[in-house]
């Protein structure tokens, strides 16, 4: 039976057959020979997903700083699975396999593929035999087996281990291998390096693998490319030669003149830097959860408190957590450290050592459930039930003004409300498909959907993200402002009620509503609840007191 890979837009691509591999390799060998004749280095990027596709384009866009001529030929390699192969034909025709708000992404990929011809894509991992450098952008996920219990999870190393095995079996001696993936501390030295060393020995290669680590700090949004190319990097290598080579490579492809490299002594230090960096951020956000609840119950507006704290320069980066933190890194990275401490580094006292980081992850993973409680309570105050209520969730992505839905707090809001019997609609100006819902049986991987933690989830596969806010809110009984997208920041209460055709429950997850807007909502007969904004009750009482005094 013919197998196909289907792109997010629904385009079908036939999976390559065994007879096509030799022809594909001949094509790549010809391109590589021509590139070498022009003095170019051959770089293979393993994995052309969220990070790898843009990193491949950045490398392919590199020019020699003396001559100004292109200095790299990049081969983006993706395994030909039904889930991922579609990225290769898209990239081959100059289209980005990842959706990005950054206006630099699409033109850069098109330029490198179609004009400069410094970026090609393939399904054939034999291309590794042509490489001077390999950049590894293969996921190393952390699977949580219980919601709100990070300690029950485990790092998913199999894809990375298989990739490193393939690399060790195929690269030429002297090829630099750079792991760019965020990995459990110790992975480069104690997992990847032994795999490669064993593969080298089986091939009769006496030399040591040249293995390095340098994590990315990619941030989706309008500065997607800059967050990779024009940002500070940390790197290290398994030995002095690997450190020298990775430093040279990164200086050639990144803007290290303005954003200097930090070179660590060992890869475990580079790996730990990324884990601690993200765990710190996750912990600060979790810390604010308790003060958010305190504020709600004691008449305090935490939004104003945070603004006041930001006036102090040392605390200027404090932010309100919203309904969970989301994104690919912050919800999982502390788990990689916790898991590595036992399973890679061999210590048995992890539960005594790691007290704060796991708790922070658990708090962040479950914060969104409180939004469902607030929605229930707001409807109850209007004499309505959450079961059967039409609820509009405004914002599916994990952060403002991007279309990235990975581990968004909104997903848990939707799932919990669905479990409670609500009828859900979703609006988001940036999200075309919410794959965590639409394809929840297989996305992000079979058996990994958050749907397994809730009942009554099958109907969510039919949800489609709406683009017309006025149409989406029509006849809604509740609206949840889940993400501070620009489109939601100046919503007029009169307009909201007019579109809905009735007063409704309004739940603010990010301090989107001003005090005047909250007051107007009450004047229109709405009920308002919000994360961390206990002063709303005071506004409600003042509004009703004023209304009763005028009658």
Where are these regions (language model features)?
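Structural/interface elements that position substrates and couple domains in central-metabolism enzymes
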Residues: 1-551
């Amino acid at each position: 039976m013919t197998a196909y890979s289907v792109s997010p837009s629904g385009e079908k691509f036939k999976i390559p057959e065994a007879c096509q591999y030799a022809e594909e390799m001949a094509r790549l060998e010809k391109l590589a020979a021509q590139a070498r004749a022009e003095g170019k280095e051959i770089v293979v990027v393993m994995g052309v997903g969220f990070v790898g596709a843009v990193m491949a384009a950045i490398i392919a866009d590199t020019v020699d700083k003396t001559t100004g001529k292109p200095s790299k030929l990049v081969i983006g390699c993706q395994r030909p699975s039904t889930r991922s192969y579609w990225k290769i034909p898209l990239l081959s025709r100059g289209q980005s396999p990842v959706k990005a708000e950054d206006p630099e992404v699409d033109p850069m990929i098109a330029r490198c593929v179609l004009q400069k011809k410094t970026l090609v894509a393939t399904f054939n991992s034999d291309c590794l035999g042509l490489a001077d450098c390999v950049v590894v952008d293969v996921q190393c996920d952390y699977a949580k087996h219980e919601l709100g219990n990070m300690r029950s999870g485990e790092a998913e190393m199999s894809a990375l281990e298989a990739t490193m095995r393939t690399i060790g079996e195929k690269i030429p001696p002297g090829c630099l291998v750079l792991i760019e993936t965020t990995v459990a501390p110790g992975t480069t030295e104690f997992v990847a390096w032994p795999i490669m060393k064993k593969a080298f020995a089986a091939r009769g290669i006496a030399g040591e693998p040249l293995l390095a680590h340098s994590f990315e700090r990619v941030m989706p949004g309008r500065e997607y490319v800059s967050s990779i190319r024009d940002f500070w990097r940390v790197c290290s290598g398994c030995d002095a030669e690997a450190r020298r080579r990775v430093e040279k490579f990164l200086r050639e492809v990144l803007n290290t003149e303005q954003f200097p490299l930090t070179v660590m002594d060992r890869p475990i230090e580079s790996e730990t830097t990324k884990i601690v960096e993200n765990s710190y951020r996750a912990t600060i956000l979790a810390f604010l959860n308790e003060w958010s609840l305190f504020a709600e119950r004691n008449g305090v507006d935490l939004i104003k408190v945070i603004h006041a704290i930001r006036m102090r320069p040392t605390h200027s980066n404090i932010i309100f957590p919203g309904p969970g933190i989301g994104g690919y890194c912050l919800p999982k990275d502390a788990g990689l450290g916790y898991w590595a401490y036992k399973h890679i580094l061999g210590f048995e006292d992890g539960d005594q050592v790691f007290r704060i980081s796991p708790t922070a992850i658990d708090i962040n993973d479950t914060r969104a459930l409180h939004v469902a409680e607030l929605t229930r309570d707001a409807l109850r105050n209007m004499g309505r039930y959450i079961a059967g209520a039409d609820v509009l969730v405004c914002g599916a992505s994990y952060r403002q003004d991007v279309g990235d839905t990975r581990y968004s707090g909104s997903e848990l809001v939707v799932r919990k409300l669905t479990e409670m019997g609500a009828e859900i609609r979703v609006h988001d100006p940036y999200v075309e498909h919410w794959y965590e819902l639409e394809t929840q049986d297989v996305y992000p991987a079979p058996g990994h959907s958050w749907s397994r933690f809730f009942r009554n989830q099958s109907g969510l596969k039919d949800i489609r993200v709406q683009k017309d806010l006025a149409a989406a809110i029509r006849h809604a009984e509740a609206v949840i402002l889940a993400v501070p997208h620009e489109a939601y920041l100046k919503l007029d209460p009169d307009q909201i009620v007019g579109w809905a055709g009735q007063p409704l429950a309004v739940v603010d997850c990010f301090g989107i509503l001003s005090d005047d807007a909250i007051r107007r909502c009450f004047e229109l007969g709405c009920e308002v609840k919000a994360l961390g904004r206990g002063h709303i009750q005071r506004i409600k009482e003042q509004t009703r007191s004023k209304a009763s005094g005028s009658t």
